[in-house]
């Protein structure tokens, strides 16, 4: 439930942000004199209802920190002491955000588990007071209500939410290696039932407002309003507030009840959970599933189960104590530090550090309607970008357009889009076989065959029909951008935009700049990527850039291990057991054996012995037999269309036997196999930083995890070196270097860190 979702899920949550304070004044209410001194929370009174507004200054989202906590307690004490106020509404002034969670930096500053435990206990006490409020409080939710934000909402007596796409509720703490620490593990099971609460807390998934209503997480929904004199968002917030105020009055007058009637299924589930045997079976089943999926690499899920069990079996006091103690324990684990580091890295990689481009890209064009081209088209039209999709054949173009439509239609099936919205989005796409309309293109992304001659040909054609300001971006995964730009008349407008497959699911976009690429071109490429919803790293040009360059030596070692006689299934088990979401042999099949051969040959020429390991002949023979991986139905495994099951390809036995290499017993234990794979990757990543291919360790970690599936629990290659220890990494490399040679020679920057224990990639 967690490890398999950790890569894809982290980016959905903006649960934590650093807050900077500045005063704000709430106007259209009767206000208290204390209002002028508050910066995050203010309130006014409508009749006998206090309307509490959350509005953290200088931030797009509201988050919970010590200042917010102090102001909230102050406001609630004033409301409780005021006899003229009989109820309250809690609402956000920010469009698209109720409260997005707690400030992650509060935990980063903790040096002991006890400090983190105190943070949890302070939150528990605050929300306990709210839960026991003598005056009913209605949470009016519009936008993200996550983590501590949801814990705040469920401590209120009533919850109303807008029924729109931006309103989501969830507890994503597990994706940061911690647990809901302000009462969430105790209140959620009582509110939505134990099974649903476990699902929310163990996956970190977002719940849409309509689903939340069915679960009992929300009591009432408010339909969003359309445009008027004010914007739809402003009108909807005003309407939400009006409805919430009326309900608060009704609760105070006892004309409406805060209790929601349960359906038959909910009643049966609630009754079943009163039986001790049933509860024990639920715990056992959930624990077994967690252990299977996390492989023991993520401690938070089991701690969540323990906290819930403590509350259900020993009472609320024991439950809250267990929650706060386990929160403290988790906050200082290596896994939590790794996952929080990834979150912070994502925040950095979702900003355009190159500034606003001189001209926004309004018309995009894509060359090649294959898997990648169609994928790029889908994520572009989905965000409102007018897109031309060009291919050389009617069949290819039709297949690409159908892929885009299917991707959008899948969202309709999941109720993420309506049919009308799908058709409206799809109308942004125009398919064609010629360059008609390219004279208006602001950017062209080529996704044609990985051949330098082909790319030169299309670049010349594009420059002959596009305006001077048009940017030419290549989706190549390995060909140096300066070689592609060699035939360009405007090399300052040429850049690399390396997407990952499947484009609509993989979050990373690797942007590659040459010495001639202008800053404005880079700013435009980043702006387009951000609009497409991507997490972006910007790297310097060179063979393999960053991601392919790190993957290649690792896969070379994988081939060597297979040639030494390790079974593909065992190798997959060893690598997933170390934290990779996809096993190494399966990864080769997914990438494509022909692609792996092409990259191995090209980068082998560029980097020589350092990229040694397995024999490229293994890949060549597989390609000659048609064993290209999943796309051909056969690789190291045999794949059945429409089935997730796969079996070993017995025809590989002869190929591997003929290319067998002697195993070296001193470096062939299961642990050594795991570290041979990981250290090849890590050493190359650090070398990329040393050579200036990477600008920052954070971008290196984000690229490795979100583009290549580096174990999230390790936080990326640079975080891994900091947490595991540079000296221990170097010791491993030296051990393997003595057995295999220079491909394991540690780079100088890694040696520098090993020689100085105070030297860290993250200070």
Swiss-Prot record:
Annotated positions of the Phosphoserine modification: 231, 316, 419, 647, 650
Catalytic activity entry: a (3S)-3-hydroxyacyl-CoA = a (2E)-enoyl-CoA + H2O; a 4-saturated-(3S)-3-hydroxyacyl-CoA = a (3E)-enoyl-CoA + H2O; (3S)-hydroxyoctanoyl-CoA = (2E)-octenoyl-CoA + H2O; (3S)-3-hydroxydodecanoyl-CoA = (2E)-dodecenoyl-CoA + H2O
This protein's UniProt keywords: Acetylation, Fatty acid metabolism, Lipid metabolism, Lyase, Membrane, Methylation, Mitochondrion, Mitochondrion inner membrane, Multifunctional enzyme, NAD, Oxidoreductase, Phosphoprotein, Transferase, Transit peptide
GO molecular function: enoyl-CoA hydratase activity; long-chain fatty acyl-CoA hydrolase activity; long-chain-3-hydroxyacyl-CoA dehydrogenase activity; NAD+ binding; transferase activity
Family the UniProt entry places it in: In the N-terminal section; belongs to the enoyl-CoA hydratase/isomerase family. In the central section; belongs to the 3-hydroxyacyl-CoA dehydrogenase family.
Localization (cell): Mitochondrion; Mitochondrion inner membrane
Name under which the protein is recorded: Trifunctional enzyme subunit alpha, mitochondrial
Record organism: Mus musculus (Mouse)
Described purpose of this protein according to its UniProt entry: Mitochondrial trifunctional enzyme catalyzes the last three of the four reactions of the mitochondrial beta-oxidation pathway. The mitochondrial beta-oxidation pathway is the major energy-producing process in tissues and is performed through four consecutive reactions breaking down fatty acids into acetyl-CoA. Among the enzymes involved in this pathway, the trifunctional enzyme exhibits specificity for long-chain fatty acids.
Annotated Gene3D superfamilies: 1.10.1040.50, 2-enoyl-CoA Hydratase, Chain A, domain 1, NAD(P)-binding Rossmann-like Domain
PROSITE patterns noted in UniProt: 3HCDH, ENOYL_COA_HYDRATASE
UniProt site positions, description: Important for long-chain enoyl-CoA hydratase activity: 151, 173
Known pathway: Lipid metabolism; fatty acid beta-oxidation
Gene assigned in the entry: Hadha
């Amino acid at each position: 439930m967690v490890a398999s979702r950790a890569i894809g899920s982290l980016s959905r949550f903006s649960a934590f942000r650093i807050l900077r304070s500045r005063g704000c004044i709430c106007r259209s209410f009767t206000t208290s004199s204390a209002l002028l001194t508050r910066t995050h929370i203010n309130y006014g009174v409508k009749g006998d209802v206090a309307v509490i507004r959350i509005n953290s200054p200088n931030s797009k989202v509201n988050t919970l920190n010590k200042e917010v906590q102090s102001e909230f307690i102050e406001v609630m004490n004033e409301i409780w002491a005021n006899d003229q106020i009989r109820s309250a509404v809690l609402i956000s002034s920010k469009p698209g955000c109720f409260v997005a969670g707690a400030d992650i930096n509060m935990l980063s500053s903790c040096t002991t588990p006890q400090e983190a435990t105190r943070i949890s206990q302070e939150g528990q006490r605050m929300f306990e007071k709210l839960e026991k409020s003598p005056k009913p409080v209605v949470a009016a939710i519009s936008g993200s209500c996550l983590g501590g934000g949801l814990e705040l909402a469920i401590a209120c007596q009533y919850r109303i939410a807008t029924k729109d796409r931006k309103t989501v509720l969830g507890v994503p703490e597990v994706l940061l290696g911690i647990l809901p620490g302000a009462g969430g593990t105790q209140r959620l099971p009582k509110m939505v039932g134990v099974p649903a609460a476990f699902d929310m807390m163990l996956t970190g998934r977002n719940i849409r407002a309509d689903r939340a209503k069915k679960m009992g997480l929300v009591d009432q929904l408010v339909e969003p309003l359309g445009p008027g004199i004010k914007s739809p968002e402003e009108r909807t917030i005003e309407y939400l507030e009006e409805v919430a105020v009326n309900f608060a009055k009704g609760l105070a007058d006892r004309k409406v009840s805060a209790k929601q009637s349960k359906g038959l299924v909910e009643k049966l589930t609630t009754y079943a959970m009163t039986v001790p045997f049933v509860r024990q079976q639920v715990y056992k089943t959930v624990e077994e599933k967690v252990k299977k999926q996390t492989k023991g690499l993520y401690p938070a899920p089991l701690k969540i189960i323990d906290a819930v069990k403590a509350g259900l079996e020993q009472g609320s006091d024991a439950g809250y104590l267990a929650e706060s103690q386990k929160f403290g324990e988790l906050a200082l684990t290596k896994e939590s530090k790794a996952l929080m580091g990834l979150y912070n890295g994502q925040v950095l990689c979702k900003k355009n550090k190159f500034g606003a481009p001189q001209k926004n890209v309004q018309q995009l064009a894509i060359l090649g309607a294959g898997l990648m081209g169609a994928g790029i088209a889908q994520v572009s039209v989905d965000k409102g970008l007018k897109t031309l999709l060009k291919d050389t054949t009617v069949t290819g173009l039709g297949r690409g357009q159908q892929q885009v439509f299917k991707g959008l239609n899948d969202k309709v099936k999941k109720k993420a889009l309506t049919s009308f919205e799908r058709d409206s989005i799809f109308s942004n796409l125009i398919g064609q076989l010629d360059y008609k309309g390219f004279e208006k293109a602001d950017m062209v992304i080529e996704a044609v065959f990985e051949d330098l001659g082909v790319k030169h040909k299309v670049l010349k054609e594009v420059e002959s029909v596009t305006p001077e300001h048009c940017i030419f971006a290549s989706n190549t995964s390995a060909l140096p951008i300066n070689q592609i730009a060699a035939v360009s008349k405007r090399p300052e407008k040429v850049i690399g935009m390396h997407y990952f497959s499947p484009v609509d699911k993989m979050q990373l976009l690797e942007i590659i700049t040459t010495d001639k690429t202008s800053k404005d071109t880079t700013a435009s490429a980043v702006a387009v990527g951000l609009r497409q919803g991507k997490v972006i790293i910007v790297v310097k040009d060179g063979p393999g850039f960053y991601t392919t360059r790190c993957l290649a030596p690792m896969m070379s070692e994988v081939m060597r291990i297979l040639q030494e006689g390790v079974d593909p299934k065992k190798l997959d088990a060893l690598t997933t057991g170390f934290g990779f979401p996809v096993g190494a042999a399966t990864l080769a099949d997914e990438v494509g054996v022909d692609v792996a051969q092409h990259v191995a040959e090209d980068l082998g020429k560029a980097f020589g012995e350092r990229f040694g390991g397995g024999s490229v002949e293994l890949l060549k023979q597989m390609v000659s037999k048609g064993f290209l991986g999943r796309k051909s139905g056969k690789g190291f495994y045999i794949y059945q269309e429409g089935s997730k099951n796969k079996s070993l390809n017995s025809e590989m036995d002869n190929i591997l036997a003929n290319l067998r290499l002697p195993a070296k017993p001193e470096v062939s234990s299961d642990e050594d196999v795991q570290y041979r794979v990981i250290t090849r990757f890590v050493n190359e990543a650090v070398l990329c930083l040393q050579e200036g291919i990477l600008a920052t360790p954070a971008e290196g970690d984000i690229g490795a995890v979100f583009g290549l599936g580096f174990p999230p629990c390790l936080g990326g290659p640079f975080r891994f070196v900091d947490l595991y220890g540079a000296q221990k990494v170097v010791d491993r490399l030296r051990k393997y270097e003595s057995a295999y040679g220079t491909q394991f020679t540690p780079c100088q920057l890694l040696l520098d860190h090993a020689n100085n224990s105070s030297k860290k990639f993250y200070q």
